[in-house]
Amino acid sequence: MGAEPEIAIADNRDESRYEIRVDDELAGFTQYRPRPRDAIAFLHTEIDGRFEGQGLGSRLIAFALDDARSRGLGVLPFCPFVKGYIERHPDYLGLVPEAERERFGF
């Protein structure tokens, strides 16, 4: 048996995206745009096909949403994957500003 792969997630602010790496190889990212009034808009999430089915997308989004929460940022889930994650994990719904929830179907 091989060693467990090393998984690292970080905010790459130069690229405006959170990245997930497996053994130092980029496995996926979620692109965002900072918004005025203390919010972050998630635009697109992508996991490389070689890494699909391992739960990396969910780990990436959980990290990004937890980071937004710790920074006091509201979340605008334009990305369908992020929106779906919030639907499946309603404890994150509070990050979506009340005035924006109807827009996203919440």
What are the functions of these language-model segments?
Residues M1-S16:
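Active-site rim helix/loop that mediates acceptor-substrate recognition in acyltransferases
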Residues S16-A27:
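Conserved beta-hairpin
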Residues A39-G49:
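Conserved acetyl-CoA binding element of GNAT-fold acetyltransferases
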Residues F51, G55-L60:
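Conserved acetyl-CoA pyrophosphate-binding loop and the N-cap/start of the following alpha-helix
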Residues R59-G74:
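Conserved acyl-CoA
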Residues S70-R103:
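C-terminal structural segments of small proteins and small subunits
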